[in-house]
């Protein structure tokens, strides 16, 4: 099986690479690339994302044909894709970090700044927080409800269709921290920084 972690110059993704390689061992071939042909021929794709919504979208668009190839992989061919942090946020139609920016539009919705309730909640939201699993999800197999995952973000994805939400976390409000829509999976938290439970989520994705 071939799995591609998309490297589109969106910040340091070494921890994502290391975690996937640790779980994959020699059973899965992990490629780290933005090569369009390698993405097309992959069985699964991982879309990481660090930085702002706009900077990540701009970095994707800067590589000729990458967005079209990801659309073909995910929407047309319906192969499994996992978005992590801003990788998940880019599923949205629009993001409002820095300026209004068009997302990939795979899951209708928007990305807005977390309401800190007059500085009652610190932003960015950094650290371990409990997740509330709200529907059965393939990537949560073997993960207990109320498990703790690691977060670093100031913006939240608000999908129009609430049925895609697989988990939330309570920080200022019920923030979406995981989605599943057919072959599209996303986590707002960082599985690669979430210790053994995070590695289990990576394993579940690789086992799809």
Curated annotation (Swiss-Prot):
The active site is at 85 (nucleophile), 190, 192. IGPS catalyzes the conversion of PRFAR and glutamine to IGP, AICAR and glutamate. The HisH subunit catalyzes the hydrolysis of glutamine to glutamate and ammonia as part of the synthesis of IGP and AICAR. The resulting ammonia molecule is channeled to the active site of HisF. The lineage of its organism: Bacteria, Pseudomonadati, Pseudomonadota, Alphaproteobacteria, Candidatus Pelagibacterales. It is found in: Cytoplasm. PANTHER family: IMIDAZOLE GLYCEROL PHOSPHATE SYNTHASE SUBUNIT HISH. This is Imidazole glycerol phosphate synthase subunit HisH. Pathway: Amino-acid biosynthesis; L-histidine biosynthesis; L-histidine from 5-phospho-alpha-D-ribose 1-diphosphate: step 5/9. Its EC number is 4.3.2.10, 3.5.1.2.
